[in-house]
Regions:
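A short helix->loop->beta-strand "cap" motif at the edges of active sites that frequently abuts
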Residues: 2-6, 31, 125, 217-218, ...
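Adenylate-forming
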Residues: 1-3, 16-20, 162-175, 204-216, ...
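Conserved AMP-binding A3 loop
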Residues: 59-85
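Conserved pre-ATP/AMP-binding loop-to-beta segment of ANL
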Residues: 27, 32-34, 40-63, 70, ...
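Conserved AMP-binding
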Residues: 105-110, 226-227
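Structural core segment of the AMP-binding/adenylate-forming
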Residues: 1-41
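Conserved AMP-binding/adenylation subdomain of ANL enzymes
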Residues: 82-101, 109-204, 239-240
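Short gly/Ser/Thr-rich phosphate-binding loop of adenylate-forming enzymes
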Residues: 11, 185, 189-213, 218-241
Length: 250
């Protein structure tokens, strides 16, 4: 590659190979062929002290998706991130503890995921990593989906993911017997209308099997990125868990 300037190698390299590499980069300005041990020695001989950052220093350049125009590189400062994490703290801290676990699956190029992961790391909450395409057991073959395998207590998502989870639950219900489908519908109605006795049965029997599809331990979920559909929000609030919504459309 014409841009290559520095080659670092380790172990005992073949002299002929080193000569060939050197001949290819020797004509380039500031080109270096150096052993890893020498890199370590140079570092020890030229120690650089820590350089504390300031609030106005750039922490990240986050690119927008481009859904409403050309993607833009948004410059985020340390102050931006700290303020955002502080707002997430105000929202989530009363409900979380050290025994919680968080399943991360959105790309870190997604600002919601980036901020929430920073928060989880700051408070020492365990993070597991998955993928959108392997979240549910319906999406994979001969193995468990990420939600069932990791069994998180916290989940963050965007509308498309919540719709995927809702469809997974509905497909399981539709594949069940007529009696089980009727029980599910009655349970949704009883909980939505706060009917005490049947609501208890729904929580302990019907919805327990529904929640098993997402690992059975989710206590809270956060939705962002765009408004979640009202029907999906109400369905999952009833059948799965409380979903705190960051965007409202109704």
């Amino acid at each position: 590659t014409p841009l290559l300037r520095v080659v670092i190698y380790d172990g005992e390299a073949d002299e002929n190979i080193l000569n060939r590499i050197h001949s290819k980069i020797s004509g380039r300005p500031n080109a270096v062929l150096i052993h890893y041990d020498e890199v370590i020695r140079n570092g020890k001989q030229n120690m650089v002290g820590p350089a504390p950052t300031q609030g106005k220093d750039v922490a990240c350049i986050m690119y927008t998706s481009g859904s409403t125009g050309k993607p833009k590189g948004v410059i985020l400062t340390n102050d931006n991130l700290i303020a955002t994490i502080a707002s997430v703290t105000m929202l989530l801290k009363p409900y979380l503890n050290q025994s919680d676990s968080y399943l991360a699956y959105l790309p870190l190029a997604h600002i919601l995921e980036f901020v929430v992961e920073c928060y989880m790391m700051y408070y020492g909450i365990a993070i597991g990593y998955g993928r959108v395409k392997t979240l549910t057991s319906n999406s994979v073959r001969k193995c468990e989906g990420d939600l069932v395998a990791f069994r998180p207590t916290l989940l963050v998502g965007v509308p498309a993911v919540w719709e995927l989870i809702r469809k997974g639950i509905v497909s399981k219900v539709q594949a069940a017997s007529a009696t089980k489908k009727k029980l599910f519908d009655m349970s949704m109605w009883a909980k939505s209308n706060n009917i005490p006795l049947f609501k208890q049965f729904a929580e302990s029997v019907v919805f327990k099997s529904v929640r098993a599809q997402t690992g059975g331990r989710i206590r809270y979920a956060l939705s962002g990125g765009a408004p979640i559909a009202r029907e999906t929000h109400q369905f999952l609030n009833t059948a799965l868990t409380t979903i705190i919504q960051g965007s409202v459309s109704y």
